[in-house]
């Protein structure tokens, strides 16, 4: 199984969260290969200066090339919240799962409709770097549930 976390975020290791990110990728390894793909380019930076709508379009353009051949899940605060067992079902029996974390302005509705599902981690706002860690923990928890690993107990 392959799990990709595709995020609008500047590339590079964050000294605070990088050890946690690597920790969750490592402990998930018996169940899945987990990769974090950070997307941020001049086009996204320029779009941020134009308007929220332009920014959303730039996120879609950067992310849509990852949509084919995977089960695609967008993180969207206005979507349905899942408990850990429901989240685990998203991962069950899938070859490739892509999770998308949008930029500061979220996703345009057209991108959300291209995804198989959109889920919410609640209405609070988290930094992108922290959301990466929270998502990785839930990915490992979901994999643990699916493989009867004691982590979730």
Predicted features along the sequence, with ranges:
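Structured adenosyl-cofactor binding patch, chiefly the S-adenosyl-L-methionine
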Residues: 109-153
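N-terminal beta1-alpha1 ligand-phosphate binding loop
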Residues: 1-28
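Catalytic beta-strand/loop module used to bind and position nucleotide/cofactor moieties
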Residues: 76-78, 83-110, 118-126
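Conserved strand-to-helix beginnings and helix N-cap segments that scaffold or border functional pockets
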Residues: 17-18, 84-85, 112, 132
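Catalytic-core regions built around general acid/base machinery
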Residues: 20-27, 89-94, 114
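S-adenosyl-L-methionine/SAH cofactor-binding core of RNA-modifying enzymes
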Residues: 33-96
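A structural signal for isolated positions on well-ordered beta-strands in alpha/beta enzyme cores
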Residues: 2-6, 35-37, 98
């Amino acid at each position: 199984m392959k799990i990709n976390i595709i995020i609008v975020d500047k590339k590079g290791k964050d000294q605070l969260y990088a050890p946690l990110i690597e920790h969750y990728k490592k402990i998930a390894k018996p169940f899945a290969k987990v990769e974090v793909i950070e997307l941020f380019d001049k086009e996204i930076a320029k779009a941020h200066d134009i308007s929220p709508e332009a920014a959303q379009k730039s996120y879609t353009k950067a992310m849509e090339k990852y949509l084919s051949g995977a089960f695609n899940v967008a993180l969207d605060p206005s979507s349905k919240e899942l408990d850990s067992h429901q989240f685990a079902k998203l991962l069950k029996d899938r070859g490739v799962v892509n999770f998308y974390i949008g930029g500061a302005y979220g996703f345009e509705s057209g991108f959300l409709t291209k995804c198989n599902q959109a889920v919410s981690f609640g209405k609070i706002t988290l930094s992108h770097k922290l959301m990466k860690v929270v998502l990785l923990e839930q990915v490992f928890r979901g994999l643990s549930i699916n493989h009867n690993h004691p982590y979730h107990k």
